[in-house]
Amino acid sequence: MPLTPADVHNVAFSKPPIGKRGYNEDEVDAFLDLVENELTRLIEENADLRQRVAELDQELAAARSGAGASSQATSSIPLYEPEPEPAPAPPQPVYEAPAQPAAPQSEDTAVRAARVLSLAQDTADRLTSTAKAEADKLLSDARAQAEAMVSDARQTAETTVSEARQRADAMLADAQTRSEAQLRQAQEKADALQADAERKHSEIMGTINQQRTVLEGRLEQLRTFEREYRTRLKTYLESQLEELGQRGSAAPVDSSANSDASGFGQFNRGNN
């Protein structure tokens, strides 16, 4: 059964028999308060890291599934607001856990990646649509001019008709060439934007995966520290209780403070 802050808070030691040496109650209570505060902080830090790993998993899944979504769907993703760090525990003589790294703004990077992809897609569609509209207009104008010129040429002479048809064919060929060139340029721009957006998306997702790996390693370190901390605390308390029960009544009572300090120093050295 895991040790909880409530267990440390509610622990009670029986007083030694008359004539037996015992620890100072105030010092024992003060030490237990330090243990309770540190254990509470470790549990809260562990829970916070679990929550951040879960949030990174959700952000990674959302970024993968929303890579081709519209800008309206992308704007509905909530921005990540980091939770405040827990209040630091009071100074204590036991081993202190390593400092927690700052929470990365991982959700902002996922939102930016999705928006870049959406913007690239919108720009490509807009360029393609504009180029097609211009090409259709050029073809329509060219056909109208050609028909008018052919009608006028028929009324004048066969020579004028032949010349008009040649000019009409030339205009149609030029319009077709220009429309194909504009479509090709628009497609090249769209492909370049898409490739750049995919590259940025891959870089951002790689950063998110690295941050997730770091947080998972940090979580495992905290788990190991918690297990070692509980084991050392339990061993220390059991050894002190056993030593207290084995000591005889011949030693002076006022030497308890020195033995407390000695045992407490050994416990600190073992943790360090």
Curated annotation (Swiss-Prot):
Pfam families: DivIVA (PF05103). Signal peptide: none annotated. InterPro entries: DivIVA_domain, DivIVA_fam. Induction: Positively regulated by the stringent response. Gene3D superfamilies: 6.10.250.660, F1F0 ATP synthase subunit B, membrane domain. Residues 62-76, 94-105 have a biased composition (Low complexity). It comes from the Bacteria. Phosphorylated by PknA. It is found in: Cytoplasm. CDD domains: ATP-synt_Fo_b. Residues 1-22, 62-109, 243-272 are annotated as: Disordered. SUPFAM superfamilies: Apolipoprotein A-I. Important for maintaining cell shape and cell wall integrity by localizing peptidoglycan synthesis to the cell poles. Protects PbpB (PBP3, FtsI) from oxidative stress-induced cleavage. Belongs to the DivIVA family. PANTHER family: CELL DIVISION PROTEIN DIVIVA (PTHR35794:SF2). This is Cell wall synthesis protein Wag31. It comes from Mycolicibacterium smegmatis (strain ATCC 700084 / mc(2)155) (Mycobacterium smegmatis). The gene is wag31.
